[in-house]
């Protein structure tokens, strides 16, 4: 009974708040851990946070910053990957980005941009 009162009080005063937690978790994971939206969403679901709570905050992620993070990850990975041809390299980069939780449309976009930049040089 006392525990319930304490928890209720903490929730009323916003010390315990799922939305605040989601906002901070999403911000930290995409900015510092460089996770994609899919992996962040899965991690929040594992923490028993309802999708209706975290989905709006995932959509608030700045698209340009998100793509810049993905592009930088792919450029760094490209330097360390050993592949016999362009097809194998692309597959390895796609698998890497998918494992980080990025969406296929964003991965394809960044790989295409990277290939276009390589052709310009």
Region annotations inferred by a language model:
Residues 1-121:
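An alpha-helical, amphipathic repeat domain used for nucleic-acid recognition
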